[in-house]
Amino acid sequence: MECARLTRYGLLSVTGDDARAFLHAQLTKDIENLPPGRATLAGWCSAKGRLLASLLVIPAAQGFLLQLSRDLAPGVARKLSMFVLRAKVRIADVSETWAQFGVWGDGATGPAEPNAISHRGNIITVHVGEARYLVLGPANEVALAPTTGEESWTLQEIRAGRPLITAATQDKFVPQMVNFDELGGVDFRKGCYPGQEIVARAQYRGQVKRRMVGARAPAGVDLRPGQEFKGGTVIDVAPAEDGSELLAVMPI
């Protein structure tokens, strides 16, 4: 079993009586009908349908937790708060006070079903993929000993085809370009959310001309998220044997 402390992810807390309805109106996923004990991928888009953040939405006490890129957390919290208006919703950036770990491999245990959540006190475990689990909770309560660096978890995410929108790739891609429709992060039957018309039009009119693919790069090739190459754009990259592995949006 491998365990890595995850520091590139931030975490927002969305609480209050109207938290579910508020997120349902903002995100690409049907949050109103999210089953109890289930997390989901979702996107938050601009009015032009471009992803401002890729999110893992996790039901928690009195509301939800939103996992996203750490470099986006303060800005997303601030901009989301602008839409609260009179709703009974409180949005807080808890990135500094919560700890997140990735656990995977032989011996890793947690909820059996994909996206299922288990709770042990304030500690939450989310099944994010085959024998891969996200464990998070208040920093003073999570007692896990890392066995490897965070880049090892990033490599697992890349191999699973799970994109992370960062400051370098923010507001550049509609959700389908990073395969959010295939990953279950978009619900085309739900009502309006920011950018919904453009996202739906791209889907039903066949206007998605770029898609995210996995690729390898040889040793010595320096790649970073947001970097453009041969018509494509790097979404994420991590060291691997004899080079690196990456996710990139490419023409199709």
Language model: regions and residue ranges:
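Glycine-rich, small/acidic residue-mixed loop/short-helix segments
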Residues: 178-186, 200-252
